[in-house]
Curated annotation (Swiss-Prot):
It comes from Bartonella quintana (strain Toulouse). The active site is at K77 (proton acceptor). InterPro entries: Aminoacid_DH-like_N_sf, NAD(P)-bd_dom_sf, SDH_C, Shikimate_DH, Shikimate_DH-bd_N, Shikimate_DH_fam, Shikm_DH/Glu-tRNA_Rdtase. Involved in the biosynthesis of the chorismate, which leads to the biosynthesis of aromatic amino acids. Catalyzes the reversible NADPH linked reduction of 3-dehydroshikimate (DHSA) to yield shikimate (SA). GO terms for biological process: amino acid biosynthetic process; aromatic amino acid family biosynthetic process; chorismate biosynthetic process; shikimate metabolic process. GO terms for molecular function: NADP binding; shikimate 3-dehydrogenase (NADP+) activity. This is Shikimate dehydrogenase (NADP(+)). Pathway: Metabolic intermediate biosynthesis; chorismate biosynthesis; chorismate from D-erythrose 4-phosphate and phosphoenolpyruvate: step 4/7. CDD domains: NAD_bind_Shikimate_DH. NADP(+) binds at E89, G137, A138, G139, G140, A141, N161, R162, T163, R164, Q165, R166, I231, G254.
Length: 293
Protein backbone atom coordinates (compact mmCIF):
# COMPACT_ATOMS: atom_id res chain seq x y z
CA UNK A 1 0.00 0.00 0.00
CA UNK A 2 1.23 3.49 -0.86
CA UNK A 3 1.48 5.61 2.30
CA UNK A 4 0.50 9.22 1.67
CA UNK A 5 -0.95 9.87 5.12
CA UNK A 6 1.82 11.85 6.83
CA UNK A 7 0.26 14.83 8.55
CA UNK A 8 1.44 18.43 8.38
CA UNK A 9 4.08 19.26 10.95
CA UNK A 10 2.21 22.26 12.21
CA UNK A 11 -1.37 23.03 13.05
CA UNK A 12 -2.95 24.78 10.09
CA UNK A 13 -6.34 26.39 9.50
CA UNK A 14 -9.00 23.87 8.56
CA UNK A 15 -9.67 25.43 5.18
CA UNK A 16 -8.91 23.69 1.89
CA UNK A 17 -9.73 24.11 -1.80
CA UNK A 18 -10.02 22.38 -5.13
CA UNK A 19 -8.83 24.44 -8.09
CA UNK A 20 -9.41 23.87 -11.79
CA UNK A 21 -10.92 25.38 -14.91
CA UNK A 22 -13.75 24.71 -15.28
CA UNK A 23 -14.56 23.51 -11.78
CA UNK A 24 -18.35 23.01 -11.73
CA UNK A 25 -17.97 19.31 -12.64
CA UNK A 26 -15.77 18.50 -9.63
CA UNK A 27 -17.15 16.02 -7.10
CA UNK A 28 -14.46 16.95 -4.56
CA UNK A 29 -16.52 19.57 -2.65
CA UNK A 30 -19.33 17.06 -2.10
CA UNK A 31 -16.88 14.36 -0.98
CA UNK A 32 -14.97 16.53 1.49
CA UNK A 33 -17.99 18.39 2.82
CA UNK A 34 -19.70 15.03 3.39
CA UNK A 35 -16.77 14.04 5.60
CA UNK A 36 -16.65 17.40 7.37
CA UNK A 37 -20.29 16.98 8.33
CA UNK A 38 -19.89 13.29 9.22
CA UNK A 39 -17.02 13.96 11.62
CA UNK A 40 -18.45 17.19 13.04
CA UNK A 41 -15.56 19.37 11.87
CA UNK A 42 -15.81 23.13 11.44
CA UNK A 43 -13.53 23.33 8.41
CA UNK A 44 -14.25 24.47 4.89
CA UNK A 45 -13.59 22.94 1.49
CA UNK A 46 -14.18 25.37 -1.36
CA UNK A 47 -14.19 25.12 -5.15
CA UNK A 48 -12.01 27.72 -6.86
CA UNK A 49 -12.37 28.34 -10.60
CA UNK A 50 -9.17 30.00 -11.77
CA UNK A 51 -8.15 30.90 -15.32
CA UNK A 52 -4.78 29.83 -16.67
CA UNK A 53 -3.22 33.28 -16.55
CA UNK A 54 -4.23 33.63 -12.89
CA UNK A 55 -3.25 30.17 -11.67
CA UNK A 56 0.33 30.88 -10.62
CA UNK A 57 -0.69 33.92 -8.56
CA UNK A 58 -3.54 31.98 -6.98
CA UNK A 59 -1.39 29.05 -5.97
CA UNK A 60 1.40 31.14 -4.48
CA UNK A 61 -1.10 33.15 -2.42
CA UNK A 62 -3.22 30.32 -1.01
CA UNK A 63 -1.66 30.48 2.46
CA UNK A 64 -2.34 34.23 2.64
CA UNK A 65 -5.95 33.43 1.73
CA UNK A 66 -6.18 31.17 4.77
CA UNK A 67 -5.89 27.81 3.04
CA UNK A 68 -3.83 24.99 4.53
CA UNK A 69 -3.76 23.19 1.20
CA UNK A 70 -6.00 21.79 -1.47
CA UNK A 71 -6.63 19.63 -4.49
CA UNK A 72 -5.71 20.38 -8.07
CA UNK A 73 -7.73 19.12 -11.01
CA UNK A 74 -7.58 19.62 -14.76
CA UNK A 75 -5.87 21.36 -16.40
CA UNK A 76 -3.38 22.34 -13.69
CA UNK A 77 -1.85 19.15 -12.24
CA UNK A 78 1.45 19.51 -14.08
CA UNK A 79 1.69 23.23 -13.39
CA UNK A 80 1.01 22.67 -9.69
CA UNK A 81 3.81 20.12 -9.67
CA UNK A 82 6.15 22.67 -11.25
CA UNK A 83 5.25 25.46 -8.81
CA UNK A 84 5.46 23.41 -5.60
CA UNK A 85 8.52 23.94 -3.39
CA UNK A 86 8.68 20.27 -2.46
CA UNK A 87 7.52 17.24 -4.44
CA UNK A 88 7.48 13.78 -2.93
CA UNK A 89 8.51 10.59 -4.72
CA UNK A 90 4.99 9.84 -5.92
CA UNK A 91 4.45 13.24 -7.55
CA UNK A 92 7.94 13.16 -9.04
CA UNK A 93 7.46 9.76 -10.66
CA UNK A 94 3.99 10.64 -11.96
CA UNK A 95 5.05 14.14 -13.01
CA UNK A 96 1.90 15.80 -11.71
CA UNK A 97 0.36 16.89 -8.41
CA UNK A 98 -3.23 16.76 -7.24
CA UNK A 99 -2.77 17.26 -3.49
CA UNK A 100 -1.05 20.25 -1.87
CA UNK A 101 -0.29 21.25 1.70
CA UNK A 102 1.96 23.63 3.60
CA UNK A 103 4.86 22.88 5.89
CA UNK A 104 5.80 26.29 7.23
CA UNK A 105 5.84 28.51 4.16
CA UNK A 106 6.82 25.63 1.89
CA UNK A 107 4.17 24.46 -0.56
CA UNK A 108 4.37 20.65 -0.75
CA UNK A 109 2.92 18.37 -3.39
CA UNK A 110 1.98 14.74 -3.87
CA UNK A 111 -0.28 12.75 -6.16
CA UNK A 112 -2.95 10.59 -4.56
CA UNK A 113 -4.28 9.00 -7.76
CA UNK A 114 -2.02 5.96 -7.39
CA UNK A 115 -3.18 5.54 -3.79
CA UNK A 116 -6.80 5.90 -4.91
CA UNK A 117 -6.40 3.25 -7.59
CA UNK A 118 -4.82 0.73 -5.23
CA UNK A 119 -7.28 1.41 -2.43
CA UNK A 120 -10.20 0.98 -4.82
CA UNK A 121 -8.91 -2.44 -5.88
CA UNK A 122 -8.42 -3.49 -2.25
CA UNK A 123 -11.88 -2.24 -1.29
CA UNK A 124 -13.80 -3.56 -4.30
CA UNK A 125 -11.92 -6.83 -4.82
CA UNK A 126 -10.53 -7.84 -1.42
CA UNK A 127 -7.98 -10.65 -1.35
CA UNK A 128 -7.48 -10.37 -5.11
CA UNK A 129 -3.88 -10.91 -6.24
CA UNK A 130 -2.17 -10.79 -9.62
CA UNK A 131 1.22 -10.70 -11.30
CA UNK A 132 0.54 -9.54 -14.87
CA UNK A 133 -1.34 -6.37 -15.81
CA UNK A 134 -2.49 -4.99 -19.15
CA UNK A 135 -3.02 -1.23 -19.34
CA UNK A 136 -4.78 0.57 -22.18
CA UNK A 137 -3.59 4.16 -22.60
CA UNK A 138 -0.43 6.16 -21.94
CA UNK A 139 -1.74 9.51 -20.70
CA UNK A 140 -1.53 11.18 -17.31
CA UNK A 141 -3.84 8.66 -15.65
CA UNK A 142 -1.71 5.77 -16.90
CA UNK A 143 1.32 7.21 -15.10
CA UNK A 144 -0.47 6.95 -11.75
CA UNK A 145 -1.60 3.40 -12.49
CA UNK A 146 1.91 2.35 -13.49
CA UNK A 147 3.31 3.73 -10.25
CA UNK A 148 0.64 1.93 -8.22
CA UNK A 149 1.19 -1.42 -9.92
CA UNK A 150 4.98 -1.21 -9.54
CA UNK A 151 4.51 -0.55 -5.83
CA UNK A 152 2.16 -3.53 -5.59
CA UNK A 153 4.93 -5.74 -6.93
CA UNK A 154 3.52 -6.73 -10.30
CA UNK A 155 6.03 -8.83 -12.20
CA UNK A 156 4.85 -7.74 -15.64
CA UNK A 157 3.01 -4.58 -16.71
CA UNK A 158 2.05 -4.51 -20.40
CA UNK A 159 1.25 -1.14 -21.95
CA UNK A 160 -0.80 -0.60 -25.11
CA UNK A 161 -1.47 2.78 -26.69
CA UNK A 162 -2.57 3.98 -30.11
CA UNK A 163 0.51 6.22 -30.27
CA UNK A 164 3.39 3.86 -29.56
CA UNK A 165 5.92 6.61 -28.84
CA UNK A 166 3.97 7.81 -25.80
CA UNK A 167 3.93 4.29 -24.42
CA UNK A 168 7.66 3.91 -25.10
CA UNK A 169 8.33 7.13 -23.20
CA UNK A 170 6.44 5.85 -20.17
CA UNK A 171 8.22 2.51 -20.25
CA UNK A 172 11.57 4.29 -20.33
CA UNK A 173 10.55 6.54 -17.44
CA UNK A 174 9.24 3.78 -15.17
CA UNK A 175 11.61 1.01 -16.24
CA UNK A 176 11.02 -2.67 -15.50
CA UNK A 177 8.59 -4.39 -15.29
CA UNK A 178 6.81 -2.03 -17.73
CA UNK A 179 6.89 -3.23 -21.34
CA UNK A 180 5.24 -1.88 -24.50
CA UNK A 181 3.31 -4.07 -26.93
CA UNK A 182 1.68 -3.58 -30.31
CA UNK A 183 -1.99 -4.17 -30.98
CA UNK A 184 -1.37 -7.21 -33.17
CA UNK A 185 -0.33 -9.33 -30.18
CA UNK A 186 -2.99 -8.11 -27.75
CA UNK A 187 -4.65 -11.54 -27.80
CA UNK A 188 -1.61 -13.21 -26.27
CA UNK A 189 -1.40 -10.60 -23.51
CA UNK A 190 -5.13 -10.84 -22.79
CA UNK A 191 -4.74 -14.53 -22.02
CA UNK A 192 -1.87 -13.85 -19.61
CA UNK A 193 -3.33 -10.78 -17.87
CA UNK A 194 -4.55 -11.05 -14.28
CA UNK A 195 -5.64 -7.40 -14.35
CA UNK A 196 -6.88 -5.28 -17.27
CA UNK A 197 -7.10 -1.50 -16.81
CA UNK A 198 -8.63 1.06 -19.15
CA UNK A 199 -7.11 4.49 -18.53
CA UNK A 200 -8.45 6.05 -21.74
CA UNK A 201 -11.63 8.07 -22.19
CA UNK A 202 -13.06 5.43 -24.53
CA UNK A 203 -16.45 4.46 -23.17
CA UNK A 204 -17.08 8.02 -22.08
CA UNK A 205 -16.39 9.79 -25.40
CA UNK A 206 -16.72 6.75 -27.70
CA UNK A 207 -19.35 4.30 -26.37
CA UNK A 208 -18.59 1.79 -29.14
CA UNK A 209 -14.80 2.16 -29.06
CA UNK A 210 -14.32 -1.24 -27.47
CA UNK A 211 -15.49 -2.93 -30.67
CA UNK A 212 -14.66 -0.43 -33.44
CA UNK A 213 -10.91 -0.50 -32.99
CA UNK A 214 -10.12 2.54 -30.81
CA UNK A 215 -10.10 0.15 -27.86
CA UNK A 216 -10.70 -3.42 -28.98
CA UNK A 217 -10.65 -6.00 -26.22
CA UNK A 218 -11.77 -9.57 -26.86
CA UNK A 219 -12.66 -10.72 -23.37
CA UNK A 220 -13.22 -14.26 -24.66
CA UNK A 221 -9.44 -14.62 -24.64
CA UNK A 222 -9.02 -13.80 -20.95
CA UNK A 223 -8.77 -16.11 -17.97
CA UNK A 224 -11.94 -16.52 -15.93
CA UNK A 225 -10.12 -15.05 -12.91
CA UNK A 226 -9.07 -11.82 -14.66
CA UNK A 227 -10.10 -8.59 -12.93
CA UNK A 228 -11.17 -5.70 -15.18
CA UNK A 229 -11.31 -2.06 -14.13
CA UNK A 230 -12.00 1.27 -15.84
CA UNK A 231 -10.94 4.59 -14.30
CA UNK A 232 -13.86 6.32 -16.06
CA UNK A 233 -16.86 6.71 -13.74
CA UNK A 234 -19.27 8.56 -16.06
CA UNK A 235 -21.02 6.37 -17.03
CA UNK A 236 -20.47 4.24 -13.95
CA UNK A 237 -20.59 0.97 -15.87
CA UNK A 238 -18.80 1.77 -19.10
CA UNK A 239 -19.28 -0.31 -22.25
CA UNK A 240 -15.78 -1.69 -21.54
CA UNK A 241 -16.96 -3.00 -18.16
CA UNK A 242 -20.30 -4.14 -19.58
CA UNK A 243 -18.53 -6.42 -22.03
CA UNK A 244 -16.25 -7.79 -19.31
CA UNK A 245 -19.29 -8.56 -17.15
CA UNK A 246 -21.03 -10.21 -20.10
CA UNK A 247 -18.13 -12.67 -20.23
CA UNK A 248 -18.44 -13.40 -16.52
CA UNK A 249 -15.41 -11.40 -15.43
CA UNK A 250 -15.13 -9.53 -12.14
CA UNK A 251 -15.15 -5.74 -12.62
CA UNK A 252 -14.33 -2.62 -10.62
CA UNK A 253 -15.72 0.77 -11.65
CA UNK A 254 -13.82 4.04 -11.45
CA UNK A 255 -15.88 5.85 -8.82
CA UNK A 256 -14.03 4.19 -5.96
CA UNK A 257 -10.72 5.56 -7.22
CA UNK A 258 -12.17 9.08 -7.10
CA UNK A 259 -13.41 8.58 -3.54
CA UNK A 260 -10.26 6.95 -2.20
CA UNK A 261 -7.87 9.47 -3.76
CA UNK A 262 -9.55 12.13 -1.61
CA UNK A 263 -8.57 10.42 1.66
CA UNK A 264 -4.89 11.48 1.99
CA UNK A 265 -5.64 15.16 1.43
CA UNK A 266 -8.48 15.25 3.93
CA UNK A 267 -6.25 13.67 6.56
CA UNK A 268 -3.48 16.19 5.94
CA UNK A 269 -5.78 19.20 6.19
CA UNK A 270 -8.29 18.17 8.84
CA UNK A 271 -6.38 15.62 10.94
CA UNK A 272 -8.82 12.72 10.60
CA UNK A 273 -8.52 9.70 8.32
CA UNK A 274 -11.95 9.54 6.64
CA UNK A 275 -13.60 6.30 5.62
CA UNK A 276 -14.93 5.61 2.14
CA UNK A 277 -18.34 4.21 3.01
CA UNK A 278 -21.43 3.02 1.18
CA UNK A 279 -23.18 6.19 2.37
CA UNK A 280 -20.57 8.39 0.68
CA UNK A 281 -20.74 6.40 -2.53
CA UNK A 282 -24.54 6.63 -2.50
CA UNK A 283 -24.34 10.40 -1.97
CA UNK A 284 -22.06 10.89 -4.97
CA UNK A 285 -24.11 8.54 -7.14
CA UNK A 286 -27.23 10.52 -6.27
CA UNK A 287 -25.43 13.70 -7.27
CA UNK A 288 -24.36 12.15 -10.57
CA UNK A 289 -27.96 11.10 -11.18
CA UNK A 290 -29.17 14.63 -10.55
CA UNK A 291 -26.65 16.00 -13.04
CA UNK A 292 -27.64 13.48 -15.70
CA UNK A 293 -31.31 14.10 -15.01
Amino acid sequence: MIDLTIKCKEKVPSRAFVVGYPIHHSKSPKIHNFWLKQYGLQGEYLAQEVKLEEFSDFLTSTKKRGFCGGNVTLPYKQEAFRLANYKDEVATMIGAANTLWYEGDKLCATNSDAYGFSANLDDSAPNWVGETALIFGAGGAARAILYALKKRGFERICLLNRTRQRADNLAEHFGKPVEVHDWHNVGEILYEADLIVNTTSVGMTDPHGWKTGSLFCDFQKTKTTTLVTDIVYTPLTTPFLQQAKAHGLRTVDGLGMLLHQAVPGFERWFGITPQVTKALRTKILEDMGEERG
